[in-house]
Amino acid sequence: MSSSKPRIALTMGDPCGVGPDVIAQALASPTLFECCTPIVVGDPSALQRSMALSGASKKVLVLREPAELPDDPGSDRIPLIAPVELSGRDIEHGRPTAATCGAVVRYIESAVAFALAGQVRGVCTGPINKARMHEHGFDFPGHTEFLQALTGSRRVVMMLAGPRLRVSLATIHEALADVPALLNVEMLREVIRITAEALIRDFGLQAPRLAVAGLNPHAGEEGRFGREEIEILRPAIESLRPPGRCTVTGPYPADTLFQRAHAGEFDAVVAMYHDQGLVPIKLVHFYDAVNVSLGLPIVRTSVDHGTAYDLAGTGRAHPGSLTAAVQLAALMAHNRFAAVSPVVP
């Protein structure tokens, strides 16, 4: 890849959902082509149908692999790789089938393989419906865990990132009642380390400020409302001092921490569980938050919304999250492949 713009594999997600629609809308303008060369991994007929719906005049350029693409293919064509063929009757808005769910898996597997082989610099994944996928044999809680298995990664951290707020999660898709037992010093150290490394290497921050949220109300109030802050969170944070390039502080009461981070006091927050971290970021970045997988050997971002079957084919799906996800993948790829691996806590 000699082009200065990184190639980003863009998986379609569920072709029966809004994935094709938001891709068609996002790629109808030249904006994304200015920061990267997007390569859609998905179904050509689904994309063409969505392009017609959006009024896009671009043509789909079907490839077998990224290596077939010229260094500068221009912005008048949308490169696409179709790892599996689907019939027209398989792709009905809002009605996923065993065939389409199987195709979704192939899209992800192919994009990851291209990234591991160096044929693309990053992967941006479209929305999938985990419940429908599970009905048809998908045995992972979600994208993040599947990517962890495909890349053989020991630990992957889920981050939601917006222009004013970034949040990593210590635990992801877990019942709230199970969260306290899942937290331990070594696990939290690793989550903090992976987040700190990504802030430097992928986000390009020279001296990031990372804050850790408490688990309990008022961060436990010195043990009155729980001892996790005393026995787990503080030891994990203290073990990372003296700090390296990243300053790590906390644990802070979560009810005020996110406002402080949003105001610019911190560059990112480590939250203890799913809704603690995702409620505030979706409140302020509902249309432009990006799901980022940290700790992988590849760059991976994703839209921060689902398949929205009720909007598929209506032209009302909003492409903002997809546009932001591709732009962030391009930025992360540029930073990662231009930089030397950082030394972090």
From Swiss-Prot:
Q: What else does the entry mention about this protein?
A: The active site is located at the dimer interface.
Q: Which Gene3D superfamilies is this protein grouped with?
A: Isopropylmalate Dehydrogenase
Query: What residue stretch is flagged as signal peptide?
Result: none
HAMAP family the UniProt entry points to: PdxA (MF_00536)
Where is this protein primarily located?
Answer: cytoplasm
**Species of the source:** Syntrophobacter fumaroxidans (strain DSM 10017 / MPOB)
| Family listed | Belongs to the PdxA family.
Chain's gene name = pdxA
What cofactors does this protein use? Zn(2+); Mg(2+); Co(2+)
One GO molecular function term of this record is: NAD binding
EC assignment: 1.1.1.262
Residues involved in substrate binding: H143, T144, K282, N291, R300
Q: Which GO terms describe its cellular component?
A: cytoplasm
Q: What enzyme category does the UniProt record give?
A: oxidoreductase
Acetylation found in the keyword field: no
Tell me the keywords, alphabetical order: Cobalt, Cytoplasm, Magnesium, Metal-binding, NAD, NADP, Oxidoreductase, Pyridoxine biosynthesis, Zinc
* Protein name according to UniProt: 4-hydroxythreonine-4-phosphate dehydrogenase
Listed under catalytic activity are: 4-(phosphooxy)-L-threonine + NAD(+) = 3-amino-2-oxopropyl phosphate + CO2 + NADH
- Location(s) in or outside the cell: Cytoplasm
NCBIfam families, per the entry:
pdxA (TIGR00557)
